[in-house]
Amino acid sequence: MNQRTGILLVNLGTPKTPRPKDVYRYLNEFLTDGRVIDLPWLKRQLLVRCIIVPFRYKQSSMLYQKLWTAEGSPLLVHGIAVQTKLQMILGESFQVELAMRYQNPSIEEGLERLKLANVKEIVIFPLFPQYASATTGSVHQEVMKHLQQWQNIPTLTFINSYPDHPGLVGAFCERAKQYDLSIYDYFLFSFHGLPERQIRKGDSTGKCLTENCCQVICSDNAFCYKAQCYRTAKAIASKLRIKLEQYTVCFQSRLGKETWIQPYTSDLLKDCLAKNRKKILVFCPAFVCDCLETTCEVSIEYAEEFKHLGGDTLHLVEGLNSHPVWIEAIKTIIQEHLPHPHSQFSR
């Protein structure tokens, strides 16, 4: 039997259930990651375990209860669907596994299943289109933590980012077909935020967050999360023929009092109303699966706030989830990153 290529799809993670104790456990694991809150170990542990989680887990539990479906966590449900559909189109030459950076199924479990399958190479595919140390970087670090214990380490391919890949862009544009773009006054491309400090930390040039430094990606800012977000938004807007003056890139999900990358989505909603833009369509291209940040934060909380302040409508473009166009995009991205042609792709 020919050895197969292993594909490990990795997303952020989800609590086992929306119950407070499970949310508590999830938040502790997530927020004590040194790449997520990059403070010295003791300070991070005290901040997370004694302040952030004890004060947030019950509120987060209530949000997860709104998000949860009869099938379970949407992030996990959609993830399993992506895994299943990708396996079907890739065929027996590949083994596709799903893992979560935090909680289950874990990265260690996914790697062990690939090891048992005796795969000759492994492709690590983080489900984060834009690179950030707190997401993709953390995934790669966790993968190496476990692989370094293996006697025989297979050929590894790490996919770092794909912010303007035609497949990703095409999939979001396919989702946008559900909406009549002509009825909206303005468009927001809302990405998950990061502390400014983390963005600067990855910069070796001293130019980070200076005027227009994120508008074009070059060798100096190739790993800049904010620059990659602008690149994603520009590609989607261009394909949908949304003009530059019709949209803004913004950032959501801020945690704590530290300055995060701006503009903040919540502030832009108020700015839209001040400019009489009352019908808004929001894209969230940092999230390929609908989750707490899209379904609850944008589609419920921001939409309610916008209407309360005098807006007419705020609609969210549905996530890619397990849409067939997205599955094909994943296949293409994998194909482009494999170190050699694969018979499955040459048919």
UniProtKB/Swiss-Prot annotation:
It comes from the Bacteria. CDD domains: Ferrochelatase_C (cd00419), Ferrochelatase_N (cd03411). Fe cation binds at residues 192, 293. Its main location: cytoplasm. It is an enzyme of class 4 (lyase). The keyword Lyase applies. InterPro entries: Ferrochelatase, Ferrochelatase_C, Ferrochelatase_N. GO terms for molecular function: ferrochelatase activity; metal ion binding. GO terms for cellular component: cytoplasm. Its EC number is 4.98.1.1. The keyword Manganese does not apply. Keywords: Cytoplasm, Heme biosynthesis, Iron, Lyase, Metal-binding, Porphyrin biosynthesis. It catalyses: heme b + 2 H(+) = protoporphyrin IX + Fe(2+). Pathway: Porphyrin-containing compound metabolism; protoheme biosynthesis; protoheme from protoporphyrin-IX: step 1/1. It is found in: Cytoplasm. One of its GO terms (biological process) is heme biosynthetic process. Catalyzes the ferrous insertion into protoporphyrin IX. Belongs to the ferrochelatase family. This is Ferrochelatase. It comes from Protochlamydia amoebophila (strain UWE25).
